[in-house]
Amino acid sequence: MMTKPNADSLFGPLVNVRQGSFNPSTWAIDLGLSRSTFSAAGYAAFRPAYPPSLFRTVLAYHRAPSAVGTLLDLGCGHGLIARALSPEFGRVVAIDPSGGMVQQASKLTDDPKITFRQASSEDLSFVADASVDLVVAGQASHWFDYTRAWPELARVVRSGGSLAFWGYKDNILLGFPEVNQILEDACYGEDEVAPGMESMATYWEKPGRDILRNSLRAVVPPPADWTDIQRVVFDPNRKTSSIAPEDEDRAWLHKRLKLGEFEGYLRTFSAFSG
């Protein structure tokens, strides 16, 4: 999802966000990132990387000169997006609520333009009004408390700036539909995966996981503050375990893994314990 602020609403009163059926008190960061078994290094090693085509799409929407302005990366994790987009901006501020992630990002980054900070999207008090050109959030926006985040974002993004959120949900193994069904059962099945081994179904944090699996459709920018909203959604065919040729340009995330590496990827799931 990509959107731009309305020019006449940056400094004016903000409309309350309609939460619908969501209980704001249940919105939180991914609690899996603070569990004792979580490894920030493992997350960096086994999670997929975003391809240049995704960043080109975001920058084409943003339509701004390169190497100038400020980028704000929300839920930056190990700093993947901040490092990739740094050449396009004069300054990058990357935040994450997890201290372990911020520490890992700092270890992996040697770029004086990037500042990492432990903070949340709901409290951007360290960011000046109308000082940010582009806000991004990759695989993080389904955890935000938007009753607090939207007002903060409307405050810090300058007139003519942009916001881009994206994420990925349940992966498929190309060419292995039977394995994909096993993985589906392990993640969301109601029955035991094996004798004495339950699925991860009850361990996903809600409503965050549901928001992500529904392609962030529940993340709706307040129309009084944001305009020119665009959504790009790609859903692979899980039954055939394939990607149609006409969808190749939209299938942005690929990662080749050995079996042991795929296990490492599964261990980065917030619902995984063991």
Predicted feature descriptions by range:
Residues 2-41:
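N-terminal, positively charged/glycine-rich alpha-helical extensions of SAM-dependent methyltransferases
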Residues 255-274:
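C-terminal lobe and adjacent flexible extensions of AdoMet/dcAdoMet transferase-like proteins
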Residues 160-255:
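Conserved catalytic/acceptor-binding region of the Class I
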Residues 133-147:
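A short SAM/SAH-binding and catalytic strip from SAM-dependent methyltransferases
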Residues 125-134:
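A short acidic, Gly/Pro-enriched loop at the edge of an enzyme's catalytic core
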